Amino acid sequence: FRRVEDREEVEPVDLDALPTAGQGDREAFEAELDSLQDQLAEWQRALYAERRRSLLIVLQAMDAGGKDSTIRKVFRGVNPQSIRVASFKEPTALEREHDFLWRIHQQTPSTGMISIFNRSHYEDVLVVRVDRIVPESTWRERFDQINDFEARLAASGTTILKFFLHISPEEQAKRFRDRLQRPAKNW
């Protein structure tokens, strides 16, 4: 990891995906995940005890990209009393009556806490740009507003970790087909 300075251009990192069920040594993967979860739980306790900083984890991905399962698997050993998961779907009528960051700001972590965003404020520039919902001047201005918003969070002691979980179009199609076969996923 490295700190990204204000408005610095960042190149995406190309990492091999972690092993998934049925690939590689599953037992070794689970043992490593358990060890990392223990370490994460220790960090969470220290963050909570210190009460000076907070952590915001932002997960972005296409539909079926693994956001929910990542949250369930990675954070299963963390004390649920000091962690909050916020999922950002299409804005409600009330949320649309406010500026686009209003609903996001309400979910940011207080000191000593961890917030995980399942999707985020980036939807308000990505979706509206791709679907041409707002004029270009609006989404361009939102980029600056997001940068300013995140700078304020960082200045107040919030560390922001951003992850884009990428899957190929073929993997996405496979996951959609798998969902059709699993009643718990058909909602």
Regions found by a protein language model. Name each.
Residues 1-187:
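Glycine-rich phosphate-binding loop of ATP-dependent small-molecule kinases
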